[in-house]
């Protein structure tokens, strides 16, 4: 079971809340206008349910819709992008 991803721009995160816990993807806006995706965390009882992927996809959809690039500082996001090269056009040059 997965939940709906909510964007909390004031807290710089995307979050999924379920009765058993929550997952979040935290970002930091950069001076260049990119989103630095810095941390993905999912409560242990929710792991292996695709919550992390759901969060990454939501962040990338947001970036695409708002014409901003991303930086994949978070190791989970970086590994996910390695497996999904079709999304790498969103990655900012460093």
PLM regions and their residue ranges:
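C-terminal structural segments of small proteins and small subunits
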Residues: 58-94
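Short, hydrophobic/aliphatic alpha-helical segments
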Residues: 38, 54-60
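Conserved acetyl-CoA pyrophosphate-binding loop and the N-cap/start of the following alpha-helix
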Residues: 46, 50-55
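N-terminal first-folded block
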Residues: 1-34, 38-40
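Residue-level recognition of the GNAT/N-acetyltransferase active site
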Residues: 43
């Amino acid at each position: 079971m997965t939940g709906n991803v909510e964007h909390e721009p004031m807290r710089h995160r995307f979050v999924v809340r379920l009765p058993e816990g929550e997952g979040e993807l935290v970002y930091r806006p950069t001076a260049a206008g990119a989103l630095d995706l810095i941390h993905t965390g999912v409560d242990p009882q929710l792991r292996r349910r695709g919550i992390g992927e759901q969060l990454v996809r939501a962040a990338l959809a947001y970036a695409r819709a708002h014409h901003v690039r991303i930086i994949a500082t978070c190791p989970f996001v970086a590994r996910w992008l390695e497996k999904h090269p079709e999304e790498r056009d969103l990655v900012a040059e460093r």
